[in-house]
Swiss-Prot record:
This is Na(+)/H(+) antiporter NhaA. NCBIfam families: NhaA. It is a multi-pass membrane protein. Na(+)/H(+) antiporter that extrudes sodium in exchange for external protons. One of its GO terms (biological process) is regulation of pH. The chain crosses the membrane at residues 27-47, 72-92, 108-128, 136-156, 167-187, 190-210, 212-232, 312-332, 349-369, 385-405, 419-439. GO terms for molecular function: sodium:proton antiporter activity. Keywords: Antiport, Cell inner membrane, Cell membrane, Ion transport, Membrane, Sodium, Sodium transport, Transmembrane, Transmembrane helix, Transport. The keyword Membrane applies. It is found in: Cell inner membrane. It holds the Pfam family Na_H_antiport_1. Belongs to the NhaA Na(+)/H(+) (TC 2.A.33) antiporter family. Gene3D superfamilies: Na+/H+ antiporter like domain.
Length: 444
């Protein structure tokens, strides 16, 4: 094919949704790591006061007498993180419908492993903090940071099988679902029924849009935003609105594949009937045909697929890095760091994320495989599953998020939890990587 500009080359890669998902999570993991380092440096530098002051600065949004007055820190955690939870909701829905969780036989192992990896860490933390002020933080070590965990696994390249990566992704998705349920049920303030009722009505409107075949994204955005506002006033954490809204987004395309192929082929045949000009300029009618084909390409992709694809980049490059910058910065007094790590909250978090995750995930997996309930991921060994269980101990994003909810208003307890999260996540990530890189043997 002759190109108008021969020195310009276009390279196109058609990636599967799963490959796109892995790439997005790897990008998120790298950005998360970078901004965590920046936050820690700022919090332990002469600029620490300015750093803290920025995120505690209030931003007021009022329309008449109605509005909100929250700090930048709260706008990030309650507002921007709702977009992150919306992405989680879309990923959960896709995985249940057509992804790693759509086949119950394949999904059984990661589902059981995730349950073990949530229950045992919570029990270990609760046992250490039973009857103490930190008891409410039992949900902190339940979470796995999917971005960090997948980034570590992707760095191992061909040393791990694709099915092992799929196992970790499915496990983390179930883990995220569990974390959302825990946040909604157990980390909720006093519930205000009227705003909650309006939020429910907003959700019903979103469902009706889906049922009536509305595929335009704008109506879902407007009503979803209204639902988030009501959820913010209801007492249930506003980020839950993101997950609920995702469930109402249509997952079916406007056209069937057969109708799409027939329609596009007809339009392209019409396009070819026009003569090619010497200067390669298109006729106006050709431009209209191409626009029509573009519209049909958009229509063959479901709204949920389009949103997941378009939001991954801003979430990876803006939302998650801002969350890390606002929440990961803890001022560490190295002379008392050891004492902090020995506090029940820090100990509970570390024991939960390291020992709880490892024995919860690997232990349940081993039992399920031995009992014939589930099968080992193809091309993998139990030793590799043990390494993946260590990576499951990287709690970070969701763990910090739950810590902020569990100990809201008590900065000292939040600090202890964050120290435990940072220490456990660092240890779990490094040890899991070393185990999979140098110790675990692959099936091949």
């Amino acid at each position: 094919m002759k190109l108008y500009a021969p020195w310009q080359r276009a390279f196109e890669k058609i990636a599967t949704p799963f490959e796109q998902f892995l790439h997005a999570q790897t990008t998120t993991g790298l950005m998360l790591m970078l901004m965590t380092v920046v936050a820690l440096l700022l919090a332990n530098s002469p600029l620490s006061d300015e750093y803290l002051h920025i995120f505690h600065t209030n931003i007021d949004i009022f329309v008449g007498n109605y509005g909100f007055s929250k700090s930048i820190h709260h706008w990030i955690n309650d507002g921007l993180m709702a977009i992150f939870f919306f992405i989680i909701g879309l990923e959960i829905k896709r995985n249940i419908l057509v992804g790693e969780l759509s086949n119950i036989k394949v999904a059984m192992l990661p589902i059981l492993a995730a349950i073990g990896g949530m229950a045992l860490p919570a029990l270990i933390y609760y046992a250490i903090n039973y009857g103490d002020i930190g008891e409410a933080g039992w949900g902190i070590p339940m979470a796995t940071d999917i971005a960090f965990a997948i980034s570590a696994l992707v760095l191992l390249g061909r040393r791990v099988s694709a099915s092992l990566v799929t196992f970790l992704v499915a496990l983390a998705i179930v883990d995220d679902l569990g974390a959302v349920v825990v946040i909604a049920l157990f980390y909720t303030q006093e519930i205000n029924m009227l705003p909650l009722l309006f939020a429910f009505i907003s959700f019903l409107v979103l469902v009706s849009f889906n049922r009536f075949g509305i595929h335009a994204i704008l109506p879902y955005f407007v009503v979803g935003f209204i639902m988030w506002l009501f959820m913010l006033e209801s007492g249930i954490h506003a980020t839950v609105a993101g997950v609920i809204a995702a469930m109402a987004i249509p997952s079916r395309p406007k056209y069937t594949p057969m109708d799409f192929t027939k329609s596009v082929k007809s339009r392209l045949d019409e396009y070819d009937n026009y003569p090619i000009e010497d200067n390669y300029m298109l006729h106006e009618q050709q431009k209209a045909i191409l626009q029509n084909v573009k519209d049909k390409i958009d229509a063959i992709s479901s709204p949920s697929a389009r949103l997941e694809h378009s939001l991954h980049l801003p979430v990876s490059l803006v939302v998650i890095p801002l969350f890390a910058l606002a929440n990961a910065g803890v001022s560490i007094n190295f002379s008392s760091a050891y004492d902090t790590l020995l506090q029940p909250i820090s100990l509970g978090v570390m024991a939960g994320l390291v020992f709880g995750k490892v024995f919860g995930i690997a232990g349940i997996s081993y039992l399920a495989i031995k009992l014939g309930i589930a099968k080992l991921p193809e091309g993998s060994t139990m030793s590799q599953v043990f390494g993946v269980a260590f990576l499951g101990g990287i709690g970070f994003t969701m763990s910090i998020f739950i810590a902020e909810l569990a100990f809201a208003g008590n900065s000292e307890l939040v600090f202890q939890a964050k120290i435990g999260i940072l220490a456990a996540s660092l240890f779990a990530g490094i040890f899991g990587f070393i185990w999979l890189r140098f110790i675990a043997k692959s099936a091949n």
